Amino acid sequence: MAKITKVSPLAPAAFPTLPVIDGVRLASIAAGVRYQGRTDVMLAVLDPGTSVAGVFTRSATRSAPVLDCQAKIGGASDGPAAILVNSGNSNAFTGHYGQTSVAEVTQAVADVTGVPVGRVFTSSTGVIGEPMKHERIVAKLGDLNAALSPDALEDAARAIMTTDTFAKGASRTVGIDGKMVKIAGIAKGSGMIAPDMATMLVYIFTDARVEQGALQAMLSAMTDKTFNCITVDSDTSTSDTLLLCATGASGVDAEGNAEFAAALEAVMLDLAQQVVRDGEGATKFVEIRVTGAANDVDAKVHGLAIANSPLVKTAIAGEDPNWGRVVMAIGKSGAAADRDLLSISFGDILVAEKGWVSPNYREEDAAAYMKGQDLVIGVDLGLGAGKSTVWTCDLTHGYIEINADYRS
């Protein structure tokens, strides 16, 4: 597998300080699933009564762990729960062996932790189509269980990385009825990132109390505005998993609370944008704001057409203000557009309007703007009130180098 030695230029300065979430204990270990000399398995054990919600890839070739999680989400929440994650092998496209592997791992986790097997959730990320050496994971479960700690989120974030160049974490606190509620999450993702999730694993924990059905509804709605609005390379993974766990340890009922919902969405968006900032080979972070569409759905379609266009993304990598490629992407999207109503801007620079280049446009200003690391492309379709924002990165030689060497 490609060895990543250089941290993304778009990375945060440091991993954030995350609060301890009462009711959550974690541990990480090196099991040698694929990598040598680094941790590659994470275990989280959650107190009895924890609600667990999840969203997953819509890929038709979903991995065995995803299928198992989907079957379990929505079950009883009275007992403890556990999450086991490995990196290096996705356990996808592995036939009956993959299902057997998941069954043996989940049963082993249940035996070691005392968690009911129906409340053991697993995720795997890495190479597709190679049998999982799950016996290596099983052999480490006793050590993992013994090492569980409430203050181990950063170690967990590092254990689940594949081609990531930095560990990803985010948190928020919110006051509800005079008490503080904490939310903290970790994520991995760098390539094979596109809406309908990505090659992306995300685990978010809160000490708020939220019933499972309400937690699921909240997560599903917020995913559409966060993780389903990012793309690195337009490829949808077999393994995407986002689990949201509410332990209730704070004693605060957050169901229906607007401040809690806003804080949760902020954590999700923070993690989603970090995934884009770690896009394989990325040197620029790009926000695409679409307004004036016939409706919000059309706006998102246009935004993703721009964000996924190799021609747009390579122009951005080359710092070329090639607005013609944005016009091309809008025209091919399939959503409603009128050439003569269209306006395009790069940052605050109006590039094109009314079907033609803006009379005040100066190429040198746009070229200077494109040299920045954080860019905004604005599109106003002039058709209605629909709007959407999506996030992507540029497409560089680095992306090719990483993926050409992925399995070596």
UniProtKB/Swiss-Prot annotation:
GO cellular component term, pick one: cytoplasm
Site positions for Involved in the stabilization of negative charge on the oxyanion by the formation of the oxyanion hole: T125, G126
EC code: 2.3.1.35, 2.3.1.1
Subcellular location per the Swiss-Prot or TrEMBL entry: Cytoplasm
Pathway named in the protein's UniProt entry: Amino-acid biosynthesis; L-arginine biosynthesis; L-ornithine and N-acetyl-L-glutamate from L-glutamate and N(2)-acetyl-L-ornithine (cyclic): step 1/1; Amino-acid biosynthesis; L-arginine biosynthesis; N(2)-acetyl-L-ornithine from L-glutamate: step 1/4
GO molecular function per UniProt: glutamate N-acetyltransferase activity; L-glutamate N-acetyltransferase activity
Function in brief: Catalyzes two activities which are involved in the cyclic version of arginine biosynthesis: the synthesis of N-acetylglutamate from glutamate and acetyl-CoA as the acetyl donor, and of ornithine by transacetylation between N(2)-acetylornithine and glutamate.
HAMAP family cross-referenced by the UniProt entry: ArgJ
Name of the protein in its database record: Arginine biosynthesis bifunctional protein ArgJ
Biological source species: Ruegeria pomeroyi (strain ATCC 700808 / DSM 15171 / DSS-3)
Gene of this entry: argJ
